[in-house]
Amino acid sequence: MQQLFGVGRGTMREALKALEVQGLIRLTTGPSGGAVIERVTFDRTFQFLQNYLFFEDITIGDMYALRTILEPEMAALAVPHLGEKEFDALERSIAMSDPREENIQPAAVQRIEDLHFHDILADACPNPLLRFQCRLINRMLETMVVSALHATQEEHRRLGEASWKAHRQILAAARDADVSQVRKLMLAHIVENQRHLDLLQSGLRRRLVLDSDLRLGGAPLPQVRPMRAPAPRTRKGA
């Protein structure tokens, strides 16, 4: 490779290391060692995107504006590619997010499973770009929604019940291979979810203001947007 590119050993070593950091290759040692091409994983790609997204003012509303467009089509495209393996995974996800008291899971588990249901469908979608976009939004929502778990528990319960019911309906339509019904149900589900999450945000804002008022004994602090990425910090003396 040094001869092929006309570079020295040090330059080649640095180039290979850069490719390894990006997840494009895996370096092995030993007599039969060398560089092996690796498939870049979704998790690694998301880590890189986080560096960009950290400086963007992205809200729940921004993400749901995309979800209402992407998710119904993603689910519809996935239907012909769902087999028993996918149906079993969807059933398990629904069971994990069951809101009935005898089967209740912690709020964090329920919210993550709500999104995992959508990831299972996305993985079956034959359109790789649509699949990636849906999974990217789900991963961002996972962080934002879990960060609001200390908002009103009543709203979390309502969100869980609505999602559980919608997921059961979507799964039933998918088993019947009813593509148009899956698309319709998914759109209704996303719209309803946004309404519940808007209430969660509102409840969290009220709670933050009330807590601050009680601690400070003065006027409430200005309303904040708790689900926005914080601004980067600078070190003193930098």
Q: Predicted regions: what is each one?
A:
Residues 63-148, 163-172, 181-195:
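Conserved amphipathic alpha-helical segments that form helical-bundle/coiled-coil interaction surfaces
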Residues 54-61, 108, 154-157:
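Short, solvent-exposed segments of well-ordered alpha helices
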Residues 140-238:
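C-terminal all-alpha effector/ligand-binding and dimerization domain
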Residues 1-70, 76, 80, 205-207, ...:
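Short linear motifs at protein or domain termini
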Residues 24-35, 42, 102-107, 144-159:
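Short, charged helix-to-loop "capping" segments that act as catalytic/coupling loops
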Residues 22, 82-85, 200:
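Hydrophobic alpha-helical elements and their junctions with loops/disorder across both membrane
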